[in-house]
Design a protein with these regions (language model features):
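Glycine-rich phosphate/adenosyl-contacting loop at the front of the ribokinase-like
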Residues: 1-60, 65-79, 243-251
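Beta-strand->loop->alpha-helix junctions that form or flank phosphate-binding loops
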Residues: 32, 58-63, 81-92, 162-164, ...
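Conserved phosphate/ATP/ADP-binding segment of small-molecule kinases
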Residues: 153-233, 240-246
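Conserved phosphate-binding/catalytic loop of the ribokinase/pfkB sugar-kinase fold
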Residues: 86-87, 97-133, 138
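Short beta-strand scaffold segments in enzyme catalytic cores
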Residues: 46, 94-98, 107, 224-228
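Short gly/ser/thr-rich secondary-structure transition/capping motifs
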Residues: 78, 113-120, 159-166
Length: 254
């Protein structure tokens, strides 16, 4: 039995570090490169497991070297991989990441690969019942995400949706969500309210509650968080500054 089921994608992050990010038509010499686990769902599963949670990870991989890398990495973090589908027709997802080592800025191209072909018929839906919490994002096909959210809610789980990458959602989505965790840009996408400060974030959170979501957590980077439920709003100051944020490159290096 797992504490939490994560539905999401794995992509092999291929990161190139150098003094700059190449522009169109330019070839540059980099300093180093690294290959490691990526994808929001994969990163969330690893983070939860390292915090002591038991994780069931649902995804789809290609039957290739990167797929084997994924299984190996997940198993090393004690994540249940028994509900990952392996495809002989599709490749494992990859992301090419150019990183400017001086500024930390990056440019990323993601090819989702196998997860983009995931269907409801392939998922062992009943494995979700063995968890207390269901967590997902918007990297898996929308119809699959909605199917799993609905099943999880009907099975009594707490549903958490990290709405990234932001995309248009039907009203059906919101009634199955207990916790909605957008960042500033994603909150603006769903509410139309541009967030320049905490007051804007509070207004955005209030509007999301009015759309039918039970609890909203808007992440504001180093500015902290805004947490909103029907009768209460909480302004969390500077919480992020006191926490070590482990970025993708550090996760890759374990």
């Amino acid at each position: 039995m797992s504490d939490i089921t994560v539905l999401g994608i794995f992509v092999a992050d291929i990161s190139f570090l150098g003094n700059k990010i190449p522009i169109t038509g330019e070839t540059i010499l980099g300093d180093s490169y690294n290959v490691g686990p990526g994808g929001k769902g994969c990163n969330q599963a690893i983070a939860i497991s390292r915090l002591g949670g038991k994780v069931n990870f649902i995804s789809k991989l290609g039957n290739d070297d990167y797929g084997k890398l994924a299984i190996d990495k997940l198993k090393k973090d004690n994540i249940d991989t028994s509900n990952i589908i392996i495809s002989n027709k599709h490749t494992t997802g990859v992301a090419g990441i150019h990183v400017d080592k001086n500024t930390g800025k990056n440019a990323i191209t993601v090819v989702r690969g196998a997860p983009s072909s995931l269907t409801t018929n392939e998922i062992n839906i009943h494995s979700i019942k063995q968890s207390k919490i269901f967590l997902t994002q918007l990297e898996i096909p929308i119809e699959v995400t909605l199917y799993c959210l609905k099943f999880a809610k009907e099975s009594g789980l707490i549903n958490i949706l990290n709405p990234a990458p932001a995309c248009k959602l039907g009203e059906d989505f919101f009634k199955f969500i207990d916790y909605f965790t957008p960042n500033e840009m994603e909150a603006e996408f769903y509410t139309g309210i541009k967030i320049n400060d905490k007051n804007d974030a509070k207004a955005s959170a209030k509007k999301l509650i009015e759309m039918g979501i039970k609890k909203v957590i808007i992440t504001l980077g180093e500015k902290g968080l805004v947490v909103k439920e029907a009768k209460e709003i909480l302004d969390v100051e500077d919480v992020i500054a006191s926490i070590l944020i482990v970025d993708d490159l550090r996760i890759q290096k374990n």
